[in-house]
Amino acid sequence: MAKRGYKLQEFVAHSGNVNCLSIGKKTSRLLLTGGDDYKVNLWSIGKTTSPMSLCGHTSPVDSVAFNSEEVLVLAGASSGVIKLWDLEESKMVRAFTGHRSNCSAVEFHPFGEFLASGSSDTNLRVWDTRKKGCIQTYKGHTRGISTIEFSPDGRWVVSGGLDNVVKVWDLTAGKLLHEFKCHEGPIRSLDFHPLEFLLATGSADRTVKFWDLETFELIGTTRPEATGVRAIAFHPDGQTLFCGLDDGLKVYSWEPVICRDGVDMGWSTLGDFCINEGKFIGCSYYRNSVGIWVSDISELEPYGAVSEDKNECMVKRFSVLNDQSERMGSGPRGSVSPDYETREIKNIYVDCGNLNVAQNPGSLKATLPLESGKVATMVSEKQNAAYFGPAGDKYSSTSRDSDSGEESSYSERESIPFSRTKSGMLLRPAHVRKTLAKFEESKQSAVVQSATRKKSGLAVEEEPQTQNAFLSEQNASKPFDAEDSIIKGITNKFEKALSSEPPTDEANRMFLKPPRIHRSSNSKYNDTRRAMSADPATFGKGGMENSGDVEDIPSKTERVLSREKPGDEQKNTEYPSGSRELNPVKIVEGVNVVSGRTRSLVEKFERGEKTTHTEGASTTIEQNNNAVQEDPRKTSRQTGETPVISTRRARSTPARVMPIVLNRDSNVTSDEPPLTQPARTSSFPVMPVILNQASNVTYDEPSVALTQESRTSHARILPVTFNQATNITSEEASVTLRRQRRNSAARVRPVLLSQATSHECPVTSVRPLRTSPARVMPTKLNQSVNMTSDTSHIASMHRVSPTQMLATPTVIDQVADMTLDETHATQIQPACDNMPQKEEPNISDREDDSDITENLMLTHNEFLSTLQSRLTKLQIVRHFWERSDVKGAIGALRKLTDQSVQADVISILTEKIEILTLDMFSQLVPVLTSLLGSRTERPVNVSLDMLLKLVAVFGTVIRSTVSAPRIVGVDLHANERLEICQICSAGLHKIQRILPVLARRGGLITRKAQELNLVLQEP
């Protein structure tokens, strides 16, 4: 082996022994060393004086690491304490405690403020620098951990231990994914391939092994060397692996596994090395000294020059191959390398939904050999593009079209650095691995091209390099500095997004996003939620304050909630310009405040007082009660009849109005033919009166009178239907229908009454205030219906299926309590097998367009009242959010018992999971539990999504803390953490008992509930 490596410098680094060192991979110009003198020293390669010494440890430093920007420094000590320094501020910013023995390995997460540490206590811990605590603990090694490496996408972390085992951990699922046990010595170094789905492991057993991360199989191993492996790293182009041994440097190709070159370096203990600008830079240590070693990669195979004799031999031997390639290149389609797919940058760490990597091979051009510095620049640019991609997205890759040189990026934003993927979802696109024959063929082709250029008189002294033939000219001309600045800008964005500073304008406007509307089969009710969607373009820079539509809502709603007379309200509406608005919107501390209401609610929340969301509704109730003073008993004559009255308490869910079915042998007499509906503020459908066989009807007085008081909803009157063998002896057969003001439709549920009496029994249904819309349902008939009435202009046929005739406990629970006269017997009719199918009711007396418009406008005030209530609650939460009081916002959310508002806020928090702490998790558990009991689908889905992410982040911490033995002594922080974890654990156990019920609902809820149940069952 030729002497192609040399020592650049050597200097004394510490007053005691040097235990560890690390080179910054961004610039390859900074060096960290840790020693027995409890210090971490920063060095600039090429200089012998330390510009900075970091103090704070009280025991020897065993491990050090830079972050990707070389701004933060991490150091683990023999006591198990980990300290974090900021080089720009020259101070220690964090200290982490948790390991029971020396911290032997530390590593920064590639994105976000996370880090991992391994210790001799066999535990691997993942820490969050903002939460100042451990968020995940992995146990499985039987001896200490010696090295740690994150996957390029940050979703996996790999640990190598003194037990000769390499373990792959899935950060998203929080569990062991796979382990490799083929080494016979302690693991000393790990590295991921920059382009392929491949892992290399170096061990003290003097071998390097290559593992396929798609199948988790061993695909190759090197022959045992004379000495053990100290450090390994892939070349940025991915073709070769550089392996630092105890006594020298080896260069391996990984497919096939061949030793391409070797250099005797003469170092003592290699600590770390890097490859930058065509140079190999290694750092070794011995006692208290550090040595810097350099080797020129252009002089190493397969990147170095081949001898002249070997060139000529290759030209003669493969001249036929050259002629064939020239003939193929002159044809209509140029020759394409069979291994072009291995040269493309592939998105190898993406979700299942983002596998649209462009693979258009096109024609590939062979470029002239470039200087080693330019080669490294292009390769580094390629690698950075694969990891970061354009526009600042974390997880994206760029595939290059060889024909046009265009780039297409495929990226997906992540809520946390390692989320949104299940266990084992790291994927790799199909690629072509080169066999030995293909590798030799590509090498021979490169030699033939070089010889051809030499014969033509080209003044090129450097020998060709195989990888240059696959780099596009556009990529070669792109400066590295521009790419480096893009990467720096991307990283700065991530740091700002994950920092603990007060929320930015984007965070302040997080609640201005249009709520997600889930359309279920209950569309009549869900259609009213459409108006909540807001066009983001209508919001200005100031958020809600600059939106004219939002400002108009409180003013209109204030008129609804006011106690003014209807005449006054009409006067106010005569001024559409807003000059006569009663209570304009005011802006107080960035929050829209309606005078006299919103601000008082916010102040009450700050004082901790209890508030209610029914204040506005009570005003409307009082106004409606004043408008309706009619006694329902006035509709019946003083002739001794006993009215049947159905009453119901106020409720917030849609009501079901019960149609009355009068069966056989029922005699109803009346002198007054019109069937009228009394005047009222709002009403529900008049229940259809169905007179069955053998019924004698004479209009002596109203047969059915329905009076409904104090309502904010209204519905249309349903027809009166007469069945077979019905004798109608009436001089006036018309039915007068009086339509009153109404706001929403109601739902009809059938009640079948069998009456065998001739008493005059008017049936009166009295129902109190209803605050939510309902749905009209078709009525039910007992037998086939023949319309034989002169009132056919309002008649319709209603048919139902047999199953709709069954009375279930749910239906009975929703029906109002009825008190019937002793002469009236209530009976539930059995289902008939020969019932006709369900059919939509056809009402012939349709309203004209003006009536429809009027009816729609009558529901407008109720809709605005609902929106105003939700807006007020969201403003309360936003009031805390703008003060960076996330905990206070969650506390306010618990008091606001509005599931729609809770679902909206939690859906935003799901996208910002990094701001939540374990304490906030304990406060969110009751809210999430209540959302799981919602009858609508969206709150349940939002709750399950949040629980899946929270359990993935905090589940391991909660389980380990609750199951850990009690610590002897007084530790206030430990006791507080234990109490919080116990609260979270109890809440999760309660949720786990609810999941089997949710799993039976079907659809997306079932899948998420089953997934959460499996996660909670893990030990």
Curated annotation (Swiss-Prot):
Gene Ontology MF terms: microtubule binding
Annotated region described as Disordered, given as residue ranges: 388-424, 455-474, 517-581, 607-652
UniProt main location, coarse: cytoplasm
Gene3D superfamilies named in the record: YVTN repeat-like/Quinoprotein amine dehydrogenase
Compositionally biased intervals (Polar residues): 465-474, 614-628
WD repeat ranges per the UniProt record: 13-53, 56-95, 98-137, 140-181, 183-221, 224-264, 266-303
Locations listed in the record: Cytoplasm, Cytoskeleton
Basic and acidic residues composition-biased segments: 553-572
Cellular component, GO annotation: cytoplasm; katanin complex; microtubule; microtubule cytoskeleton
The keyword Cytoplasm is annotated on this UniProt entry: yes
UniProt keyword terms in alphabetical order: Cytoplasm, Cytoskeleton, Microtubule, Repeat, WD repeat
Renumbered ranges of motif DWD box: 114-130
Database matches in InterPro entries: G-protein_beta_WD-40_rep, Katanin_C-terminal, KTNB1, WD40/YVTN_repeat-like_dom_sf, WD40_repeat_CS, WD40_repeat_dom_sf, WD40_rpt
Gene Ontology terms describing biological process: microtubule severing; regulation of unidimensional cell growth
Phenotype of gene-disrupted mutants: The double mutant ktn80.1 ktn80.2 exhibits normal growth, but the quadruple mutant ktn80.1 ktn80.2 ktn80.3 ktn80.4 has a severe dwarf phenotype, with small and round dark-green rosette leaves as well as wide and short petioles, probably due to cell elongation defects, and associated with a complex cortical microtubule (MT) network with stable entanglements. Plants missing KTN80s have a disruption of KTN1 recruitment at MT crossover or branching nucleation sites, leading to an abolishment of MT severing.
Tissue: Expressed at low levels in siliques, flowers, leaves, stems and roots.
Source organism superkingdom: Eukaryota
Subunit field text: Component of KTN80-KTN1 complexes composed of a hexamer of KTN1-KTN80 heterodimers that sense microtubule (MT) geometry to confer precise MT severing. Interacts directly with AAA1/KTN1 and KTN80.3, and weakly with KTN80.4.
Job of this protein: May participate in a complex which severs microtubules in an ATP-dependent manner. Microtubule severing may promote rapid reorganization of cellular microtubule arrays. Confers precision to microtubule (MT) severing by specific targeting of KTN1 to MT cleavage sites such as crossover or branching nucleation sites. Together with other KTN80s, regulates cell elongation by modulating MT organization.
Family: Belongs to the WD repeat KATNB1 family.
Protein name as annotated: Katanin p80 WD40 repeat-containing subunit B1 homolog KTN80.1
Source organism (scientific name): Arabidopsis thaliana
Gene name of this polypeptide: KTN80.1
